[in-house]
Amino acid sequence: MKISHIPEHIEQLTIMNVPEYYKLNNNHALIVRSKAETDFWLKTHYGFQVMNGHVFYTETMTDFQAEVQLRMNPNSKFDQAGLFVMISEKCWLKTSLEYIPDGPSHLGAVVTNNGYSDWSTQDFPTELANEQLRFRIVRKRGDYTIYVKKIHQWEQIRITHLMEDIGNKPIKIGFYTCSPSKNNGFETEFLEFTTENI
């Protein structure tokens, strides 16, 4: 059964790292403002370890499909919003648009296994960074397929595996936002978030 979490079941979601604020607007979308200097990244290339981004999540033990529809209003480099899946702090993935003011922005995914993150990207026109985007993650037996919907068509952007996903831990599934820069955070309008066991 597909569950729509915005606006009907927001109160059933758990928050990881409370954002600057969140509220429902007149269109029944959830507005979330990130805090500055927030991110999800472990070790690789940059050397730092940061796990303080904001996630609104539910949990499952089964295969699933999750989707989010959102509109960002970014203002600083690497402002980002999308979908997030976590098995543990050393095993997780995120997919999002990451804003680059002088463009192009990055559309892609970060996958973290054994405490090391990797990052795959494709260019995305920065002038479209505040347009509506949809992200989808499908889990099948520990394997994850990541999609993005640009305009009217779904596009597969990654297939990956989470090494700790062996069926013995709850899987956190949610939408997320963060602002790695030292500037102010930014607002994202989350219009829809659905999960479905498959």
Question: Residue ranges of each PLM-predicted region?
Answer:
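Extracellular glycan-recognition regions
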Residues: 1-198
